[in-house]
Amino acid sequence: MNWDRIEGNWKQLKGKVREQWGRLTDDELDKIAGHRDTLVGSLQNSYGIAKDEAEKQIKEFEARCERDKWVQ
């Protein structure tokens, strides 16, 4: 999936992002604003994970968005 589609629908997807990564606050989600690199950094900080792991989790989220048709 093209990340631009997620970024463009960020407001609608924030709830799904929050379900996936519950440690992210509303302020952080607003700051991320769909920017993938910012999400990577926030996941690293909030969960104490390496960049590679954050990237892996985001790819899984992208696949879930496409599979469950959260983004058209």
Language model region names:
Residues 1-72:
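Intrinsically disordered, low-complexity, hydrophilic segments
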